[in-house]
Amino acid sequence: MSDLTKRALEQSLKNLLLQKPLHKITISDIADDCGINRMTFYYHFKDIYDLVEWSCQEDAAKALAGKKTYETWQQGFEQIFEAVLANKPFIMNVYHSVSREQVETYLYKLTYDLLEGVVEEQAAGMSVRPEDKAFIANVYKYAFVGLMLDWIKHDMKGDPREIIDRLDRVIHGSVAAALDRFRVDKPASNPGV
């Protein structure tokens, strides 16, 4: 029953975002739209931003289910684009009403989860420090999120598949190469530029 109520609150928020900006939506608005009292809202979420964060995490979990490997990262990234596009009014409203920072935080979490799986898989059999693996995942995270924020900024125009294909051409094989350069079980070579 708890998940059902949370999903109903999420849907009410998304319905209201079609009518007005996030900063003008109140908990009473959401509760009224959902047909519950305000205290029920507070039983599940501390505020509207907590609901926004939960909604983003739920969408992320659905988007990335089973797509955190080197062979499927493109599908995972495409699923992220599709999840963002499917929630365009929600994302655009949060992007313009609250702050770009909240959208960035959502996207950073989403893409890091995807990339962490890819880096771990590619690091199999290599002796690479955890902080170096995290650094590599973060570098790619910033590239991915930068591309996506640019796409959002331009009203989600452009084909996500084309963006992903171009990105793949740039970074293909580079995760394994970066991990190899960070190996602690072999001497460092001159990485060049």
Region locations from a protein language model:
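Amphipathic, non-transmembrane alpha-helical scaffold segments
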Residues: 2, 6, 56, 104-108, ...
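An amphipathic alpha-helix adjacent to DNA-recognition modules
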Residues: 3-6, 10-14, 18, 23-27, ...
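Cytosolic nucleotide-binding catalytic cores of signal-transduction proteins
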Residues: 19-20, 127, 193
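Short, hydrophobic secondary-structure boundary micro-motifs
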Residues: 25-26, 92-94, 103, 160
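Residues in the helix-turn-helix
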Residues: 40, 90
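Amphipathic alpha-helical segments that line or abut small-molecule/effector binding pockets
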Residues: 74-89, 138, 146, 161
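Amphipathic alpha-helical packing segments from all-alpha helical-bundle domains
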Residues: 100-125, 131-146, 176
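C-terminal peripheral helix-coil segments that are non-catalytic and often amphipathic
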Residues: 150-193
